[in-house]
Structures are given as C-alpha cells and as structure tokens.
C-alpha cells in the first residue's frame, strides 16, 4: 500500500497545485510534509500556466472564480471558448450578504449588506476570519475602506467617514485607521484637499492603496469654476497619510469611466472611456514605475466598442472593475447590464488587440428599489497569505465595558 511518504516531490507538488485555494487550510493539516510545502509556497510549474484564481461578487455573495482565457484569440479560426467557473463560497458567507470587498496581501475585507453594517476580514488560505468592531461611529452605507500594511508588515484598515450636518449645512469627511495589532481605531489628522467619489474602490499595490481623485474646489453659489481633471492619489499605510497628486495617462472627468486594477504586487493598470457618446474607445494603460510619489505609464490596449455595440455603448462609470492578462494582451471588464426594464445581468467583456471584443454572460443580477446594484467586482489573481487574523477573544466585551 502506497503511503504519503512514498510519493515523490514532483507528484506531491502536482497534487497540491490542483487543490482549490479556498480548501488549502484544510489540506495543510493533513500532514507535516504537506504543511511544509504550503508554507514554503512550493507549487509545481504546471500551476504557473493554469487559469488564475480570483474572487467575484455575485448577487451579494462572495464567490470563487477561475477565468480560463485559453482558446481566446485563436488565429486558426477555431471555436473560441471562455470558461468562467464560478462557485459560491460556503462557511459563514452563507449567513450574510456582502456589499463591498477590498483585498490586499491575500486578505479580503468584506462589508456586509444589512441594516447593522459590519466589517469582517477573511484569510481564505488559513480559513480564518476576524470581525472588526466599529470605533466611535457606527459603519455607514457610503463609508469607504482600504486595507494595507506598513513597512513592518503590520496590517491596517483605512476608513472614510462622510456625513452631512443639516444644521450647519456642511458635508464632513473624516478618516480613521484600524490597527490589527492594537485592535483599535484612531482618528487621522487629515484635511483633504481632494475628493474621491464613493464608487472609486482603489487598487492595492505593495501595501498601499491608490485612488482616482480630483482637487477639492469650494464652489460659490453664483460662481463658475472649471471642473478639475482627476489624478492618481496614494494612501501610504506606513506614514498613514496621502501623498501628492500623481498623473493619470488620460484626462478624466465626472461621468467618464475610470478605474484602477493591480497586477500582482508590481504594477497598476488604469482603464478609461470618455463619457462623450461620440467617443466609444476604451483605453488601458499599465505602469512601468509605481512608487508613493512617482508613477509612469505605458499604453496597453485601445479598443473601439462602436463596431460591436454601437456608438452609445458605455461601461459603468460607477463600476469599472477589470483585470488584464499581459501575456495574452487581453483585458476582462466586468459590467452590470440592463437588459430590460426589470431584468439585469452580470457580464464580462473580453477585449484585445485588433478590435477583438467578446461578451460573456455571468447570469442574472439583483437590482434594488432604485434599479442600482453594485456591479461584479473581481480581483487580480489570489496569492495565499500566512497572515494570522484570528478573532481576538474578549475584544467585544472590553469595548462594552468602556
């Protein structure tokens, strides 16, 4: 009878490479040898060429997804195929609906969709979750978040608190940061000179988060001011501050489509589509250098959508979720489509060189009373993380006794 100890190193690595990422934690406990392989992240070369693993939001549920682009752009005229294998996650995700998700370093920060909004951080690799108690102010529907880490690899959560004081007739914006090591929130002394739209989720890179933002201008009732173009803005989790404005590779204004995505932990990608209905081109750029206060861009793709869907086709300016495959020279853009007055669906548009466009339907999507639903959100390829985020026992009790 063959024992696990009898298996060759190559065979073990091949077996482990086929384990779903959401099941890695359970497999690690099988034996010490397998656990060591996982800790060293020794995965076979076959995995490097396999379809990448990602997470996607669908019907307010977090799902795992393998988006197989093999066969796309066949030059021999053969049948194209795209296999977006989507599987709803089990565990505690069966009990809650999720409205927003943010990721960094293999950790997922989830915002629940319920009257009493909650935050939870999940490490899919270790199978650990951690509920994040709010600070002095309860979580609100339009709060914005980012997750990252500092130079000491200490993980933190940034929170934007935006609210309107009707007595003062003024909108306030405050920033808080949560430190995993101290299990507490702190208010940051930041006087924003910029505005970041609520639908801009940002992109994580090297522990920091980058946003599309515009200069903040105080408008007078009778005054007329030109609308400032958007810029790139980085939040540094080490200094716990925002940097200076950095250039985007295009002029982006309100109602233009603009979104960011990260490529592993090395590059940013930016998607742009002008809001002018006479212009239907989609542009994607990739950074060649990305630091807190320095950035440079190279063009990646430019595709005209008019020949396929007409001049009026526009991606959602409040969505813009996408990822790219540099090797295949492809981009996959996620879209919330209105297929009728009462029917909505999630879809992806695969775009490539020489005007290539292919739509892949992902199924029906829910709509709320206003007809608006956050579109599907997909992240770059997931990389397992060994970051421990076990729930701190007694933390909630300590807060209640304060």
Curated annotation (Swiss-Prot):
Source organism, top-level taxon: Eukaryota
Entry-linked Pfam families: F-box, FBA_1
Cross-referenced SUPFAM superfamilies: F-box domain, Galactose oxidase, central domain
Originating species: Arabidopsis thaliana (Mouse-ear cress)
Domain F-box: 1-56
CDD domains (alphabetical): F-box_AtFBW1-like
SMART domains registered for this protein in UniProt: FBOX (SM00256)
Official protein name in the record: Putative F-box protein At3g20030
Record-linked InterPro entries: F-box-assoc_dom_typ1 (IPR006527), F-box-assoc_interact_dom (IPR017451), F-box-like_dom_sf (IPR036047), F-box_dom (IPR001810), Gal_Oxase/kelch_b-propeller (IPR011043), SCF_F-box_component (IPR050796)
Disulphide linkage map: none
Upper classification of the organism: Eukaryota, Viridiplantae, Streptophyta, Embryophyta, Tracheophyta
């Amino acid at each position: 009878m063959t024992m696990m100890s009898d298996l060759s190193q190559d065979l073990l690595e091949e077996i482990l490479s086929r384990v779903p990422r959401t099941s890695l934690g359970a497999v690690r406990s099988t034996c010490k040898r397998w656990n060591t392989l996982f800790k060293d992240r020794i995965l076979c070369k076959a995995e490097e060429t396999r379809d990448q693993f990602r997470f996607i939001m669908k019907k307010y549920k977090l799902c795992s997804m393998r988006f197989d682009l093999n066969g796309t752009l066949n030059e021999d005229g053969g049948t194209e195929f795209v296999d977006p294998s989507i599987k709803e996650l089990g565990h505690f995700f069966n009990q809650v609906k999720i409205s927003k998700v943010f990721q960094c370093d293999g950790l997922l920060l989830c915002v629940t969709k319920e009257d009493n909004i909650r935050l939870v951080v999940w490490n899919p690799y270790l199978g650990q979750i951690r509920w994040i108690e709010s600070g002095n102010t309860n979580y609100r529907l339009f709060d914005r978040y980012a997750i990252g880490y500092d130079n000491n690899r200490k993980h933190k959560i940034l929170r934007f608190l935006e609210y309107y004081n009707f007595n003062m007739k003024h909108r306030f914006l405050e920033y808080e940061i949560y430190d995993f090591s101290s299990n507490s929130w702190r208010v940051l002394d930041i006087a924003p000179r910029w505005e970041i739209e609520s639908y801009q989720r940002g992109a994580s890179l090297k522990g920091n988060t980058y946003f599309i933002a515009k200069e903040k201008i105080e408008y007078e009732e009778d005054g007329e001011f030109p609308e400032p173009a958007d810029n790139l803005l980085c939040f540094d989790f080490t200094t716990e501050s925002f940097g200076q404005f950095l250039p985007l590779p295009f002029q982006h204004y309100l109602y233009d489509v603009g979104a960011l995505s990260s490529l592993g932990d090395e590059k940013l990608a930016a998607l742009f589509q002008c809001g002018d209905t006479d212009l239907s081109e989609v542009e994607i750029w990739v950074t060649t250098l990305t630091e807190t206060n320095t950035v440079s861009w190279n063009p990646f793709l430019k595709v005209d959508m008019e020949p396929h869907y007409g001049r009026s086709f526009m991606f959602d300016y409040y969505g813009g979720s996408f990822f790219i495959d540099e090797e295949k020279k492809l981009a996959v853009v996620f879209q919330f489509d209105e297929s009728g007055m009462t029917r909505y669906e999630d879809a992806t548009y695969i775009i490539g060189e020489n005007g290539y466009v292919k739509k892949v339907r992902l199924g029906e999507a829910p709509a709320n009373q206003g007809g608006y639903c956050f579109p599907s959100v997909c992240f770059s390829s997931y990389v397992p993380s060994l970051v421990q985020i076990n729930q701190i026992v007694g933390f909630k009790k300590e807060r209640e006794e304060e």
